């Protein structure tokens, strides 16, 4: 099982209401697998909209999974910081798929800094 498949299965098993994101390698597979294993998934027109929709789901006391590649979090940063200070009634999990070594992206950035700056919990997968 790949990391993307594990994220999708965990969201499904945890009873997430919606998985939403903007397609971009290396994060695209997460929502594809989430939909394939029975989760309700949708693509948004951009990363900001994806996070806004996910935030709305979490405001309604439901669980939302939001996926995007690392540069997409730049687009969604306003919403991320707003969510950090408003809080949510449900659950909001944001998966930012970084691309060390720029295998499929135009830049390399470390999005763990966003979590630190926003003061939100962060999980970092490891072997």
For each predicted feature, which ranges?
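Thiamine diphosphate
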Residues: 1-122, 126
């Amino acid at each position: 099982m790949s990391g993307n498949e594990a994220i999708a299965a965990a969201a499904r098993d945890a009873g997430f209401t919606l998985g939403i994101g903007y397609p971009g390698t290396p994060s695209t597979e997460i929502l594809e697998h989430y939909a394939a294993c029975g989760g309700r998934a949708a693509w948004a027109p951009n990363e900001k909209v994806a996070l806004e929709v996910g935030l709305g789901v979490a405001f309604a006391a439901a669980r939302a999974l939001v996926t995007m590649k690392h540069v997409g979090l730049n687009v969604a940063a306003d919403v991320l910081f707003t969510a950090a200070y408003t809080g949510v009634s449900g659950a909001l999990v944001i998966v930012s798929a970084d691309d060390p070594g720029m295998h499929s992206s135009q830049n390399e950035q470390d999005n763990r800094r966003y979590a630190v700056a926003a003061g939100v919990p962060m999980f970092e997968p490891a072997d």
